[in-house]
């Protein structure tokens, strides 16, 4: 389509030139030469302006580099204001305040030297990216904001983040299939398949309480959950939140949840929560009141105005009977998962899990060993496997046989208060 039009245009110009006289052609040529000369002068002037602008930019960058020399003064954004200068301001006077005529956002900040500064010119940071509470680095003399700084957290909270993911798997846990399913439904599925809950219109639980006798696999289950999800894992211990100074424990809880929001999706695991979650009572001792304040801060973070659905809490305890009812109610730790003593079938499975990397004789009967370990928990069954291996090592054997396991049961049972019948 375009080729015939080009041919028509060129033929029209040829016809026009053919109809023009020689003087007209010379005049048109001079006009074109003048236009070309003017355009060349404009291009040359534009290039010179570009060079001068580049020089100015380079000078300004050098000045900025000089002004941005470390160290900075640290400050906090207190308030962000919108400047609207009056329209009827005097324009012909000599004493016009230029700062009062500026439009845009201004900042009130508080420095680490306890000075409150109003900045009509923000500095080198985009004002739209700032919000109250942000930590910024400012110039020591002009107080202009030079850079934004990362949020400040307690160093103890930063140490709670588990950088190396645990290596445990659900296959390392024996006899707790029902508990694994409940934990996956409450913690893992809302993070990996959130759309399934939205389709049903169901709000997933905020937290899970794992309770049961010692050695039944509560902490092991939390470690396996951390290994199976891509979420950040924060591990807190209940005694770690009990601090000497007033308000210190509550600040740790607050900083932990704030860090979890920035790292979301995140799982917070609080082991031995009975250290801070005991029932409240009237006490004149300041230490007891401080523990209660720490628990109240935990309750506020669980269901306060600042709660976040991308943060899940797993709490573990072996004394669920002494926990405060406010902590146990629905909406906070919604799902309670009990970890009972393992059954006979579960004990056989646990013994097989802990001995799968050992060189075990084929004649070892794990079902018979499970019948001999009535009332043993998971930790004691692991101790049985370790003792059996040590006994085989003591007699220079290359395999662990059934008698070694029986001797291991005897040694572990001797350390228990209750007497057990270890023969089937």
Swiss-Prot record:
InterPro entries: 26S_Proteasome_ATPase (IPR050221), AAA+_ATPase (IPR003593), AAA_lid_3 (IPR041569), ATPase_AAA_core (IPR003959), ATPase_AAA_CS (IPR003960), NA-bd_OB-fold (IPR012340), P-loop_NTPase (IPR027417), Prot_ATP_ID_OB_2nd (IPR032501)
Entry's Gene Ontology BP terms: proteasome-mediated ubiquitin-dependent protein catabolic process
GO MF terms held by the record: ATP binding; ATP hydrolysis activity; proteasome-activating activity
Glycyl lysine isopeptide (Lys-Gly) (interchain with G-Cter in ubiquitin) crosslink location in chain: 235, 279, 416
Modified residues (Phosphoserine): 19
Main location group: cytoplasm
Keywords, sorted A to Z: ATP-binding, Cytoplasm, Isopeptide bond, Nucleotide-binding, Nucleus, Phosphoprotein, Proteasome, Ubl conjugation
Pfam families in alphabetical order: AAA, AAA_lid_3, Prot_ATP_ID_OB_C
Record localization: Cytoplasm; Nucleus
The keyword Nucleotide-binding is annotated on this UniProt entry: yes
Domain of life: Eukaryota
Keyword Transmembrane belongs to the record: no
Annotated residues for binding of ATP: 212-219
GO cellular component: cytoplasm; nucleus; proteasome regulatory particle, base subcomplex
Family in the record: Belongs to the AAA ATPase family.
Family matches, as PANTHER family: 26S PROTEASOME REGULATORY SUBUNIT
Role of this protein: The 26S proteasome is involved in the ATP-dependent degradation of ubiquitinated proteins. The regulatory (or ATPase) complex confers ATP dependency and substrate specificity to the 26S complex.
UniProt-recorded name of the protein: 26S proteasome regulatory subunit 6A homolog
Organism the protein comes from: Brassica campestris
Lineage, broadest ranks: Eukaryota, Viridiplantae, Streptophyta, Embryophyta, Tracheophyta
């Amino acid at each position: 389509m375009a080729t015939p039009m080009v041919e028509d245009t060129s033929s029209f110009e040829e016809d026009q030139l053919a109809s023009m006289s020689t003087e007209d052609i010379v005049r048109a040529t001079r006009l074109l030469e003048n236009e070309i000369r003017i355009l060349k002068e404009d291009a040359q002037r534009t290039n010179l302006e570009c060079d001068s602008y580049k020089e100015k930019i380079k000078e300004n960058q050098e000045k900025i580099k000089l002004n941005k020399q470390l160290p900075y003064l640290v400050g906090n954004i207190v308030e962000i204001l919108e400047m609207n200068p009056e329209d009827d301001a005097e324009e012909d006077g000599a004493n016009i305040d230029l700062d009062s005529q500026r439009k845009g956002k201004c900042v009130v900040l508080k420095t680490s030297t306890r000075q409150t500064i109003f900045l009509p010119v923000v500095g080198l940071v985009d004002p739209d990216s700032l919000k109250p509470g942000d930590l910024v680095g400012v110039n020591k003399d002009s107080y202009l904001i030079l850079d934004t700084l990362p949020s400040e957290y307690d160093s103890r909270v930063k140490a709670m983040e588990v950088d190396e993911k645990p290596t445990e798997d659900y296959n390392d846990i024996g006899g707790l299939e029902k508990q694994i399913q409940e934990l996956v439904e409450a913690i893992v599925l809302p993070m990996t398949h959130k759309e399934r809950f939205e389709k049903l219109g169901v709000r997933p639980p905020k937290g899970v309480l794992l309770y049961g006798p010692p050695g039944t696999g509560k902490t092991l289950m939390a470690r396996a959950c951390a290994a199976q999800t891509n979420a950040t894992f924060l591990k807190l211990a209940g005694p770690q939140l009990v601090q000497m100074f007033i308000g210190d424990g509550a600040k740790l809880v607050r900083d932990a949840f704030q860090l979890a929001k920035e790292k979301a999706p995140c799982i917070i695991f609080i082991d031995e929560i009975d250290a801070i979650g005991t029932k409240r009572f009237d006490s004149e001792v300041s230490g007891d009141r401080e523990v209660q304040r720490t628990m109240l801060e935990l309750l506020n973070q669980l269901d306060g105005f600042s709660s976040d659905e991308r943060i899940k809490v797993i709490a573990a305890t072996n004394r669920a009977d002494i926990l405060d009812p406010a902590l146990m109610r629905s909406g906070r730790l919604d799902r309670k998962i009990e970890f009972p003593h393992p059954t006979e079938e579960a004990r056989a499975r646990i013994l097989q899990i802990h001995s799968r990397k050992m060189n075990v004789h084929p004649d070892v009967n794990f079902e018979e060993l499970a019948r001999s370990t009535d009332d043993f928990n998971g930790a004691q069954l692991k101790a049985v496997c370790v003792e059996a291996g040590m006994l085989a090592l003591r007699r220079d054997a290359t395999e662990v046989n059934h008698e070694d396991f029986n001797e291991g049961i005897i040694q572990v049972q001797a350390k228990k208060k209750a007497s057990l019948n270890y023969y089937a």
